[in-house]
UniProtKB/Swiss-Prot annotation:
This is Potassium/proton antiporter CemA. Its main location: plastid. It comes from Pyropia yezoensis. The gene is cemA. It catalyses: K(+)(in) + H(+)(out) = K(+)(out) + H(+)(in). It is found in: Plastid, Chloroplast inner membrane.
Amino acid sequence: MKYWNLKRNNQFAFEKVGPIPRSITNTFEKFRKELDPNGESEAIEEFRISRHQTITSVKYILLLFISPVLVNQASKFFVFGPCIDYLWNQEQPKIFLNSSQEERAFAELQRFEEKIHFEVLLNPSEDISYEIIEKRVQLKARELGEYYANESANAVKNILSDLVSILVFILLMITGQRQIAVVKSFLNEIIYGLSDTAKAFLIILFTDMFVGFHSPHGWEVIIEVILRHLGLPESRDFIFLFISTFPVILDTIFKYWIFRYLNQVSPSAVATYHNMNE
């Protein structure tokens, strides 16, 4: 029974787009089933298939996203963490992996010195010697050195654990072709079950979020976080080049998908999208 369900789901997942919009064919199919004398038994069977499809899809989606995260954390803290900490402390630890870390450390130390100087100017009555100020700055420099040394070691751990997570994700994708077909069918049923207004709203939401007027600021933050996570230099030229090209590519893909695919599947949703976007 389960094998037959998966076979049906595979057919739904890889159903090709015909010349007639799917919304029209679905309406005629629903009308035909209502006139069918065996419609009740078919409805029960379709409910069983839908329930099995939902359970399988939710399980596989959770497996697909939770497994790499768990493997990432486990490999980072129990495998790569102890090894890298041991090797990192064997000799004189390397504090900085790139120039961006140096700039942030120097800027923070400079702000600390300026803060001390400001406090001295506000309280001229207090007898603060140059040796005390120098000692406080020295302690702050050691604190920053330890912080950025740990950040550099964590960046190496992140690279190795992320590679393992990617391998686990790819392995799950390769070995779960049947489950992927079920998930595709499940997502198609959800998307096509939405109203035209809901479809248009989601399209506008995602396009404005990722390729809209304010999206470059979000992309800039995301790229900076990723580069810092991997211990790579936060090159402003690379970041500006990325946010000036990647959103344009995404916008082109969105428009092509609307023109090539959604326009055939649900032309009423495309019309609603254009009306809402004007």
